[in-house]
Amino acid sequence: MSNSAKSPSGPVGDEGRRNYPMSAHTLVTQEQVWAATAKCAKKIAEDYRSFKLTTDNPLYLLCVLKGSFIFTADLARFLADEGVPVKVEFICASSYGTGVETSGQVRMLLDVRDSVENRHILIVEDIVDSAITLQYLMRFMLAKKPASLKTVVLLDKPSGRKVEVLVDYPVITIPHAFVIGYGMDYAESYRELRDICVLKKEYYEKPESKV
């Protein structure tokens, strides 16, 4: 008996995998993301054990909006499985407009609400390509005098670097490609896709939008 069903993303087949018309191919499945994130969470838990984290002195996960919101939620749960107390804060900065190339100019759109002075901060990014935004955020947060500051990145694209930045916890390294899904978008679309997919060039190279 088939378990096929209809969804806004298209038909779901017997393997539960959606067919994405805008996708050239699936780069990383949701299950692969979970496995890699769980492994990363174990490493983070080991590294922070000496910090004596508690509910009063938690690890602050600084979710960089909008792309890392799903990754942050999953990471928080995997860290909880490892016994790491966390608190989630949100920040938003961007060097992208609606295109696929960085503008090189970072705009701060949302700052953290609480003081993070003397707190342990882990910046959570969905993807690092040029590293311009991450470099900006690290400098911005260091000015707030945290007790420690590290970075975790779901997708690391070293080939796209324009500035040198240390990524403490790169979860998955990928080649140069424009990716969507699992929180990541093109022109605010496709964040809801379960898998991480390579966007077809025709969707962002033609003047007429297919979004």
From Swiss-Prot:
InterPro entries named in the record: HGPRT, Hxn_phspho_trans, PRibTrfase_dom, PRTase-like
GO molecular function: guanine phosphoribosyltransferase activity; hypoxanthine phosphoribosyltransferase activity; magnesium ion binding; nucleotide binding
Keyword match Iron-sulfur: no
UniProt EC number: 2.4.2.8
Reactions the enzyme catalyzes: IMP + diphosphate = hypoxanthine + 5-phospho-alpha-D-ribose 1-diphosphate; GMP + diphosphate = guanine + 5-phospho-alpha-D-ribose 1-diphosphate
Lineage top rank: taxon: Eukaryota
SUPFAM superfamilies: PRTase-like
Enzyme category, top tier: transferase
Entry's cofactor comment: Binds 2 magnesium ions per subunit. The magnesium ions are essentially bound to the substrate and have few direct interactions with the protein.
Localization, UniProt: Cytoplasm
Protein name: Hypoxanthine-guanine phosphoribosyltransferase
